[in-house]
Amino acid sequence: MKKENTAIRLKRIMSDRNLRQVDILNLTEPYCKKYDVKMNKSDISQYCSGKTEPNQDKLFILGIALNVSEAWLMGFDVPMARAKQVSDEDIGDIFANDNLFEVIDNI
């Protein structure tokens, strides 16, 4: 169930971590480049004010940049922490290893 919205969650992160909107934008920059997503000051301002909600791409970027779950950032009553991501290296190990369950247990 959705209890809050993205604006409330962003404001909470900003307060808890002593961040400004420009700091959030700076944190997103490397991920925006990596995933070819454009985000600017106006976007962050509108998300923080509640005027608009981020689309799926921008929500993903905000989630990884702030190290929070996208569902939490959207306002759902779920844990704030991101689930552990499986890296390309982990996937390579899975396919190269005969003992699949051992590799999965170590992820």
Label for each model-derived stretch:
Residues 21, 41, 56-59:
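Helix-turn-helix DNA-binding elements, focusing on the entry/boundary residues of the two helices
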Residues 79-107:
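Interfacial/linker helices and their anchor residues that mediate assembly or domain coupling
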Residues 30-54, 76-78:
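Recognition helix of helix-turn-helix/homeodomain-like DNA-binding domains
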Residues 55-72:
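DNA major-groove recognition helix of helix-turn-helix/homeodomain DNA-binding modules
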